[in-house]
Amino acid sequence: MKRYYSTLLVLVLAHTSLSAYAHTCPDPQTTSLQWGVPPSPWIENPFSPNSPQGEENTRFVRANILVAGYGQGVTCTYRNSVGDFSILWQVRTKIPARVDYSWIETMGGYVCTRGLNECQFYVADPS
């Protein structure tokens, strides 16, 4: 019986550790965004004012968690000389905790403007 419980505990801990991996927006200097191509699984946001442009001075502006009852996706907005552009990852995300002051609750979800590494989010369903 102890063997059963220990095996169950290991499986639960493994699942928890795998699902608790923090994600951030892609870095425009070290990913395919430097060539104007969103890295997989990200896509160009269809509502973005501009297409992704490969430019040396591209910088991160903000991240948004889109909410419709629960997290429906993440958009990351960047700025360069052409203007702003955003990319989208349509994935279920966990809602940030109220004590996570990096994320500010807005009408349509949450926004983070602190920085690329500070705007961490958690995927609820990695598949």
PLM features: residue spans?
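Mitochondrial intermembrane space
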Residues: Y21-S127
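N-terminal signal peptide c-region/cleavage motif recognized by signal peptidases
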Residues: H15-S17
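Bacterial N-terminal signal peptides that target proteins for export
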Residues: M1-L8
